[in-house]
Amino acid sequence: MASKWIEEQPLVHRRDIRISSKSRIAAGLLVLLVLWRYGLPSSIHFGFSSEEPKQLGAVASEHALCSRYGADMLERGGNAADAMVATMFCIGVVGMYHSGIGGGGFMLIKSPDGDFEFVDFRETAPAAIVALGKNTSAGLRSGVPGEVRGLEYLHRKYGVLPWSVVLEPAIRTARDGFLVQEDLVNYIDMAVEETGEDFLSKHPSWAVDFSPSGSRVRLGDTMTRRRLAATLERISVDGPDAFYSGPIAEDMVASLRNVGGIMTLEDLANYTVVTRDTSHIDYRGYQITSTTAPSSGTIAMNILKVLDTYDEFFTPGTTELSTHRMIEAMKFAFGLRTRLGDPSFVHGMEEYENHILSAEMIDHIRQSISDSHTQDTSAYNPDGLEVVNSTGTAHIATVDHQGLAISATTTINRLFGNQIMCDRTGIIMNNEMDDFSVPTSSPPTFGHTPSSTNFAEPGKRPLSAISPAIILHPDGSLFLIAGSAGSNWITTTTVQNIISGIDQNLAAQEILATPRVHHQLIPNHAIFETTYDNGTVDFLSQLGHEVTWYPPAASMAHLIRVNADGGFDPAGDPRLKNSGGVVALQRRKFW
């Protein structure tokens, strides 16, 4: 009965509660009358409790509105799983340029008992997949979406609120509208510039949402996505199966086939999530858990494990040399990444990832790093294999006071996916098939050979840079929920944020504000955010590094740090104008 009551009630925020002055006076007089009549102790406290509200958990994401919705779930008696589902569905509505139900991703979960689970809800190649290439039609670039199944798995195993309750904020936001803010405007402009075409206004299916009055939505406008609201409502009422069969599935298949796609209803009906092994290391005594292939969690762990061998690392006076060592570790790790692929299709992948984290490999890399110079690409990648680049993505972190912690990253790949909007459902389809390596008989980009471990096959999942991580103190208590969005910067950003938290003991917002550097080996140059220290960059140039600059917009991380007193410190990346972390508080009650 309680669940039914919750399901029927609208979300109520504390700001909605209003008590007039007259009502307060009347209530006070009534209480005084009762005290006078029955002689109750005169020392009783009236009004709200003076104690600080209890923290129920926290949420961090690329949009403060969605983080607020996640926190609402915690304040309504839900847990971190409920918060994650509500937040991710919301991000798909307002941050549709990065993610949505037409995509997929990876999720790392720490249960209250301390067990870890890696849930792979990455898109899969359709059964009729053909060789991909530069001229592949848009319809062939979409993989079978996994986000809805991933959230279903999380909710069924860990959630406590009804499914319809956790979807309600996203449905309401899509139906009633949301404010067009700076980040959305920025990504709209980037997508139009990238394609050279204003598809958001000129294509009828996109224009319904993005140009309802004939011109593109602008900063401060209210934007609605009513077709998507109806789709989410169907998923809310009929369950996740409604996405993978029936009218919603038929619309996805038809929309893709109209532009040369091969996805079938059978592909959608057969989609399943996969639970995989996690990767674990110790770093400065902290226990770090991440994911495995086809994600790049093992690569992030390799970088950190190499850097753990240096005693003086980002201590006073060592910043320049520490940055060089970190970049060198990145280059060796990305060389190892060239042989990663979907373990369900690549024989020996588990053994290879164990080798990546073995003492022998770590010692080999450490001995190969010179403090006096960098090296040619062949030293890090002797097989000459290409480095696959991922794009897009949105990262979310949630935690509750019972110890359930989740780090999840979801994506439709490049901005607005493959730029196909399903006509009837408002779903934006992914272009995840572009993350597969492409066989070629001609010299490939940068002169490197495509990796056969990441060639497309029916049902296979492409390699990804996604690297969610959860870090525990040496005593086993929760310290940090980390992860990032933004192409191959995901892996290196996650590493640097962990270093900032552990080695430099920074607060959440300080971690995220720290300038970043990225090196993925191919192309062979270190990319520095324009806010990076010039002296450090000059030092690296003297060691032989090719350096380039990039605005602080390549990677977006959102994380939750747990303070020494057990309080939650969530934060959104300051590189985004509208990101945010929210702490969920127990609602105060009258005595």
From Swiss-Prot:
One of its GO terms (molecular function) is leukotriene C4 gamma-glutamyl transferase activity. The keyword Ion transport does not apply. InterPro entries: GGT_lsub_C, GGT_peptidase, GGT_ssub, Ntn_hydrolases_N. One of its GO terms (cellular component) is plasma membrane. The active site is at T393 (nucleophile). Pathway: Mycotoxin biosynthesis. Its EC number is 3.4.19.13, 2.3.2.2. One of its GO terms (biological process) is proteolysis. SUPFAM superfamilies: N-terminal nucleophile aminohydrolases (Ntn hydrolases) (SSF56235). Residues 1-41 form the signal peptide. L-glutamate binds at R122, T411, E432, S464, A465. It catalyses: an N-terminal (5-L-glutamyl)-[peptide] + an alpha-amino acid = 5-L-glutamyl amino acid + an N-terminal L-alpha-aminoacyl-[peptide]; glutathione + H2O = L-cysteinylglycine + L-glutamate; an S-substituted glutathione + H2O = an S-substituted L-cysteinylglycine + L-glutamate. Transmembrane segments: none annotated. Keywords: Acyltransferase, Glycoprotein, Hydrolase, Protease, Signal, Transferase. Disruption phenotype: Does not alter the production of ustiloxin B. The keyword Protein biosynthesis does not apply. Glycans are attached at N135, N270, N389, N534. Belongs to the gamma-glutamyltransferase family. NCBIfam families: g_glut_trans. Gamma-glutamyltransferase; part of the gene cluster that mediates the biosynthesis of the secondary metabolite ustiloxin B, an antimitotic tetrapeptide. First, ustA is processed by the subtilisin-like endoprotease Kex2 that is outside the ustiloxin B gene cluster, at the C-terminal side of Arg-Lys, after transfer to Golgi apparatus through the endoplasmic reticulum (ER). Cleavage by KEX2 generates 16 peptides YAIG-I to YAIG-XVI. This is Glutathione hydrolase.
